[in-house]
Every structure is written in structure tokens, then in C-alpha cells.
């Protein structure tokens, strides 16, 4: 869509629109007085999952009392306007997080929820989306209906196979709202926009929103291995993420400090503080209802301390017999067997199409001469891949084998960027996506190296997107302002963006919470600390261009929408 046709959140006006506004000045002032007289104030915002009968009815009740419906617009205790028609100024674009990408302004009263209004769906597969928004706005969920009534909120699929499956169109016109999309996710995102409009302004402006995300992977990652997080806290984050149009939550649940989910295949490795499978299933179900994919991560061959604690015979040892913390001996078949047991088991618990294999910081590779320091690994590499094979080759083969395990469950694998090596005879499989997090390590490869190989990349840039509890080493807590003003998905390493020609290979990004010093913050403090970084991150993933709102305006908007 050409830029001159867009009406964005910043309220940019064309010269023609300004002229029209001047010509309608007198009528607009009169109309403004009428609108002000019938303004809505929503006192309580629904926070339940919504089934059409929740406490969200308070919102509709408030709208009823303040003239929310068309029928009530001319009442509220005073005589009707003597004018037979009402003139409205052109509507302003809604203000939401993330910002809608296009709004076509129209003249009209907009739409407010009222107790008499219905939510109807044109397709039964949209029942979950319909019930949720009905409960949140205090409307009646009427199910699948063909008739049209005043005040209806209608959800429908348009079956446009060529469109972005997460795109949607929301039309506010004639006292009704229609959300139309090629897929269920797009319909859901349209309802999130509507919910924010009502929350922030009391009404949805007349006109048409056409919206879609720029990036397909919009994520948040949680290190729940180093610090145990309650199921309720994770569920609250999923609701927050859904309202912000995120579509991934990564759960890093295995590391040196703990293994945090119940296991049937290897119960001996599970930490005392952990989530049951029933709790995880509830989390996964809630995420699915918000169109969020849960991306599990069992990191290997490093960061396996909790597994090794129960299986010390699998711990990697150097040439002097010294144990290497967190590193499993990948020359032993038993090591592959136990990790594959876990990957196969948890593939049944996490049905989403993505899987994180880790692959970072294998301690056998941080020494100057891995072959001399770990002769057992060097011998295994030569035996498997031939003379001249290295420990890096053996480690790459391990990554490929684990990728094959999850690929058998129709999962797309990803791994941390320091698990991919240059100049090896064994190459990482082409479909393993690169989770780029750091370039600070000696010899770290530039992002362009992966991209020039044709690899797809997800941005976890630790310069902007790492929230590390206790701020160890050189880490500092990220700020929403810095992300909002300085970062975009092409800024993969440090503060420099890669070439625009790689844009399509960069699938998106993820804000990551790491719990290196787990007692540094409580759950409540973590939630507060990531609040604005989450909002800034999703804004730049939805639309990487420079935002129309200043940071202070964006922060104020976030306060109104919470």
C-alpha cells in the first residue's frame, strides 16, 4: 500500500485532509460536543479468559449507561439534536501496541460495546476467538449467525490463500464491527486491536484497519531451568503476550542448575521444584488459544548438568581426567540415547512446530587445542568422519543427529549461533535455524556469514534483548526505550544492522530472560522489568520502520492500555 494512502497512529495528515478538516470546522465542533456528551468510561477491564459471561460485562454495562449503542446516542437525559443528520469529522487512527500499519479514515460515530451487542462468527472454527472477546468486552456470544443486527461484532474468514496468514482487516462502519482474516490467527489479532481500542479510548474509530506483521517469529524466551517459575506466572505472561500479538514463548527448562518438567522416561533427573506435565499441558493449551507456539529447549551437548548429576558416567573428562561442568561426553552412545529419550518424550508434550536444540558453549571447544585436551572426542571424530576430522566435526554431527530426532516429529530445529562452526568437514544441516545471540566470544562469526550461506536467522541479540537476572559480567537490564529507538530485526550483533538484502532470511526475534543469578529478582520484579522491553520488541517486530510515536508517547500509551 502506497505511503500516501496510509493514516497511521501518529496522526499524519495529508494536505487534502487538512483542507477537508478546515471546511468541516463548524460541523466538527458541533459533532465533537455531541460525542463528548456521549463518551464512554470503562471502569473495569476484563482479565478472565472469557466465555461471553465474564466480569467483562462491566465494560458493556458502562457503555450502556453512557450511550454506547446507536439507539442511545441521542438520549442520555437530554432532548435529541434538532438537526435531522449528524456530521462527524474524519476518524483518527487507533492507537495500539503494536501500532496498526494502515487505517483508512471515515466519518462516523465509531463503535462502543453495549450489553445488547452480540459477538457472532461466520465459521464455527472461530468460536474460541468469539467467546474470548465476548467475555473481555462483556458482550453476548451468539455463535454462528447469518443475520446482522445493530452493534454486532462479526468474526469471519475470508479464505484469501495469497495473503499473510496473520493479516486481518477490521471494518468499523454503520454501528457494527467486522474482523475478517485468511486465518484464525489473523482474526485473533483483530480482536486484540479492538480490545486495546476499547481499553485505551472507550471506542473503536470509524474506518478500516488493514494490518499484518512484518516478521513471522515474535517471541519471548524464559530460562525456567536456573530459576523455577510458577505455572500461574507463565500463564499470566502468555495472556500478556497474546494481547501484544506475540506468537512464541520459548521454555528453556534444562540446564546445569535444574531440569524443571516432570519426566516419565528419566524421573531421576527432575529437580524438586518443577512443573508437572498436567501443568505444562494447561500452559500449552492456553498458548494455543492465543495462537502462541511453545518452543521447548533441551540444550545439549553443553548445559546438561542436571542430567549428568544423575548419570555421572556420561560427564565429559579432559586428558587429565578432570570433569568438565555441564558437558556430556558425545563420544559415548549412551549420551545420545538419554538426550534422544528426552527429545522424543517431550515432543509429545509440546505439539508446536518449533524446537530449540541449544548447541552453545560446549566446553570442549573453548580450549585452545580441543583435540589435545580431549583425545577421546578426537578419536571418536576420526572413527566416525575419517582422518582429519576434528572435535568441531563431531559436535556438528551431534547437532545434526539431534535435529534428525526432532525432525521425525515434524519439528523445525534451531540452535544458538555458537553451535555452528566455520571450515569444518561436517556441516550443520541447512534447515537448522540460527538463533543469533552473541558475537562477543573470541572468533565469533559475523551474522552475515550465516546469512550468506542462505540460513534463516532468529534475532536474540544480547546487546538489546537479553534480560539477565543480577546483571552478571557485562550485562545490563535492557530498556524499552533503547529497543524502541535503536534496535530492529536486522540489528543481530552489537548495534550494527546487516544489509537489507538479508531481511527475508531474518524471521523475527525474541526477548530472552536468563536467570544466571536467580535470587536477584522475584517473579513480580521480572514481570515489571520486562514490561516495556516486551512492548518495544513487538512494536519493532510487527513494523521495523521508525515508529510514529515518540518514546514518551509510546510509554504513555502503554500505561493507558494496561
Show the residue positions of the predicted features.
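Active-site neighborhood of glycoside hydrolase catalytic domains
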Residues: 325-431, 437, 442-447
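Feature activates predominantly on carbohydrate-active enzymes
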Residues: 165-336, 344-354, 370, 517
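Conserved, mostly hydrophobic/aromatic
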Residues: 119, 183, 220, 241, ...
Amino acid at each position: 500500500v502506497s505511503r500516501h494512502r496510509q493514516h497511521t497512529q501518529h496522526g499524519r495528515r495529508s494536505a487534502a485532509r487538512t483542507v477537508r478538516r478546515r471546511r468541516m470546522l463548524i460541523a466538527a465542533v458541533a459533532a465533537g460536543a455531541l460525542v463528548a456528551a456521549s463518551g464512554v468510561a470503562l471502569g473495569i477491564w476484563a482479565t478472565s479468559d472469557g466465555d461471553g459471561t465474564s466480569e467483562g460485562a462491566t465494560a458493556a454495562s458502562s457503555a450502556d449507561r453512557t450511550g454506547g449503542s446507536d439507539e442511545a446516542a441521542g438520549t442520555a437525559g437530554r432532548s435529541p439534536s434538532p438537526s435531522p443528520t449528524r456530521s462527524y469529522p474524519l476518524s483518527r487512527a487507533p492507537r495500539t501496541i503494536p501500532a496498526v500499519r494502515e487505517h483508512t479514515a471515515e466519518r462516523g460515530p465509531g463503535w462502543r460495546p453495549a450489553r445488547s451487542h452480540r459477538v457472532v462468527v461466520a465459521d464455527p472454527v472461530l468460536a474460541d476467538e468469539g467467546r474470548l472477546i465476548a467475555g473481555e468486552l462483556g458482550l453476548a456470544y451468539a455463535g454462528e449467525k447469518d443475520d446482522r443486527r445493530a452493534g454486532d461484532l462479526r468474526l469471519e474468514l475470508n479464505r484469501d490463500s495469497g495473503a499473510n496468514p496473520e493479516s486481518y482487516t477490521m471494518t468499523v462502519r454503520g454501528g457494527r464491527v467486522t474482523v475478517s482474516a485468511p486465518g484464525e490467527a489473523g482474526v485473533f489479532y483483530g480482536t486484540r486491536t479492538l480490545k486495546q481500542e476499547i481499553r485505551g479510548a472507550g471506542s473503536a474509530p470509524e474506518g478500516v484497519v488493514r494490518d499484518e506483521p512484518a516478521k513471522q517469529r515474535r517471541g519471548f524466551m524464559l530460562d525456567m531451568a536456573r530459576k523455577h517459575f510458577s505455572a500461574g506466572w507463565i500463564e499470566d505472561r502468555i495472556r500478556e503476550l497474546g494481547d501484544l500479538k506475540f506468537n512464541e514463548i520459548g521454555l528453556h527448562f534444562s540446564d546445569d542448575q535444574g531440569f524443571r518438567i516432570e519426566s516419565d522416561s528419566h524421573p531421576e533427573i527432575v529437580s524438586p521444584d518443577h512443573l508437572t506435565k498436567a501443568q505444562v499441558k494447561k500452559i500449552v493449551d492456553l498458548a494455543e488459544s492465543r495462537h502462541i507456539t511453545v518452543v521447548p529447549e533441551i540444550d545439549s551437548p553443553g548445559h546438561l548438568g542436571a542430567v549428568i548429576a544423575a548419570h555421572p558416567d556420561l560427564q565429559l573428562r579432559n586428558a587429565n581426567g578432570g570433569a568438565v561442568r555441564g558437558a556430556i561426553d558425545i563420544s559415548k552412545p549412551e549420551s545420545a540415547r538419554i538426550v534422544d529419550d528426552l527429545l522424543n518424550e517431550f515432543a509429545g508434550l509440546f505439539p508446536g512446530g518449533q524446537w530449540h536444540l541449544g548447541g552453545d558453549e560446549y566446553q570442549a571447544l573453548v580450549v585452545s587445542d580441543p583435540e589435545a585436551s580431549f583425545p577421546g572426542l578426537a578419536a571418536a571424530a576420526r572413527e566416525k568422519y575419517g582422518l582429519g576430522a576434528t572435535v568441531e566435526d563431531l559436535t556438528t554431527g551431534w547437532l545434526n543427529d539431534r535435529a534428525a530426532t526432532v525432525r521425525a516429529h515434524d519439528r523445525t530445529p534451531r540452535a544458538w549461533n555458537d553451535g555452528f562452526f566455520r571450515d569444518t568437514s561436517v556441516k550443520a544441516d541447512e534447515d537448522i535455524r540460527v538463533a543469533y545471540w552473541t558475537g562477543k566470544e573470541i572468533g565469533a562469526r559475523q551474522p552475515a556469514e550465516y546469512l550468506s550461506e542462505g540460513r534463516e536467522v532468529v534475532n536474540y541479540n544480547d546487546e538489546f534483548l537479553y534480560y539477565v537476572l543480577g546483571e552478571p559480567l557485562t550485562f545490563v537490564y535492557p530498556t524499552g526505550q533503547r529497543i524502541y529507538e535503536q534496535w530492529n530485526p536486522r540489528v543481530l550483533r552489537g548495534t550494527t544492522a546487516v544489509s537489507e538484502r538479508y531481511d527475508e532470511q531474518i524471521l523475527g526475534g525474541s526477548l530472552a530472560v536468563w536467570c544466571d543469578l536467580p535470587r536477584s529478582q522475584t517473579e513480580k520484579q521480572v514481570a515489571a522489568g520486562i514490561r516495556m522491553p516486551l512492548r518495544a520488541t513487538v512494536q519493532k517486530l510487527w513494523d521495523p520502520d521508525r515508529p510514529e510515536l515518540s518514546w514518551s508517547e509510546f510509554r504513555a500509551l502503554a500505561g493507558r492500555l494496561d
